Amino acid sequence: MLDIQQLRSNLQNIITRLAQRGYDFPVADFESLESQRKSVQTLTQTLQAKRNSASKQIGIARQRGEDVSLIMAEVANMGDELKQAENQLEAVQTRLQQLLLEIPNLPHDSVPAGKDENDNLEMRRWGTPKTFDFPVQDHASIGEHLKLIDFETAAKLSGARFSLLKGGLARLHRALAQFMLDTHTQENGYNEIYVPYLVNADCLRGTGQLPKFEQDLFAVRSGAQEEADNPDKTGPAGLHLIPTAEVPLTNIVRNTIVPLENLPLQFVAHTPCFRSEAGSYGRDTRGLIRQHQFDKVELVQITHPEKSHEALESLVGHAEKILQKLELPYRVMLLCTGDMGFSAAKTYDIEVWLPAQQAYREISSCSNCEAFQARRMQARFRKGQEKPELLHTLNGSGLAVGRTLVAILENYQNEDGSITIPEILRAYMGGIERIGL
């Protein structure tokens, strides 16, 4: 969420910067609400001052033994007016808050201006795509040939965009997650957290999924328990399946003041993620690239504001290290203003090479959200006895497990349809070097 004081003092600059993201700022709505707020706030302050003055007069009159009935009646009337004005002010401030919750973050000055992914900047590449002397198969064909990916049964169980992994491939998927966690905790200094997969609406508002992106989430109905918890049906019980572990990990510091000496905080979690993929109809309908349920190892850093952009570079490096250890070619892209996520001030995407597509595809997105999420969550730090300040929050995939599996299937495929296990994973696979029929 943006700083309301910044909006009031520097509105035109903010409108211009948000326009670079393709966001049309609701100027008329904001100015109308601000006008109402000022008017009602002035009225409230005037009534409070009058009531305070009248109360003093009552005290003085009583000391003198004078009749205070008229002043008492006036104060009673003022109390009713004041309550009405306070209710109006609260209603206007609520509407302002709702408007603020729908405004995206400001892009950092180092982010290139652009409309979409075609305007992103390539920062670097690592590794050389392998050349094959046989026809390359895509990951779905390889998995089905090995009888280790079953889309048909998954569709029977759950519908489209689900999959069953079996045998050696299920084991490889598990090995990947374990390898990623070990690397991040043992080499990169992250603290592993096991998080709930169901979160409340406050968590989703804190990280920016609500209220704007509710259609991308899976809400959970709990039947009789929901009715018991919410008998007046004033709103949903509020639990959703997590779209990413970023949500629970970042919200660990919601409504918290972290001592400066405890910074930075580095969290890692391996979880399933659940997304409706509402805006992706017709895209990546075959295979594991875009699923309603997928596993991801998520990295979150909570930092001092002056350290967050340095932390972003290290976060990207931590994700890159996984691909380097797996010897998978990739490139790092700096996203332009028009391609960044809602909460991000700056984002790097890491894209892995997929031979069957002859293209680099996103496998990690690493973002610095600066104070945007912290303001929504009231996540702060304090130096000694000084006034608390907002933290900066960062997140990134380290990595998406399913997409990493896709990259291994395609980059490590053999002519006979088997898959060579990357050397770094063999210890996690009981020494197995190849998966085949």
Curated annotation (Swiss-Prot):
One cellular component (GO) term of this entry: cytoplasm
SUPFAM superfamilies registered for this protein in UniProt: Class II aaRS and biotin synthetases, tRNA-binding arm
Main localization of the protein described in the UniProt heading: cytoplasm
Positions with a binding annotation for ATP: R275, S276, E277, E362, I363, S364, S365
Entry keyword set: Aminoacyl-tRNA synthetase, ATP-binding, Cytoplasm, Ligase, Nucleotide-binding, Protein biosynthesis
An example Gene Ontology biological process: seryl-tRNA aminoacylation
Pathway: Aminoacyl-tRNA biosynthesis; selenocysteinyl-tRNA(Sec) biosynthesis; L-seryl-tRNA(Sec) from L-serine and tRNA(Sec): step 1/1
A GO molecular-function annotation: ATP binding
Subcellular location: Cytoplasm
One of the Pfam families matching this protein, by short name: tRNA-synt_2b
Stored CDD domains: SerRS_core (cd00770)
Subunit structure comment from the entry: Homodimer. The tRNA molecule binds across the dimer.
Function: Catalyzes the attachment of serine to tRNA(Ser). Is also able to aminoacylate tRNA(Sec) with serine, to form the misacylated tRNA L-seryl-tRNA(Sec), which will be further converted into selenocysteinyl-tRNA(Sec).
Annotated domain remarks: Consists of two distinct domains, a catalytic core and a N-terminal extension that is involved in tRNA binding.
Name of the protein this chain belongs to: Serine--tRNA ligase
Organism: Nitrosomonas europaea (strain ATCC 19718 / CIP 103999 / KCTC 2705 / NBRC 14298)
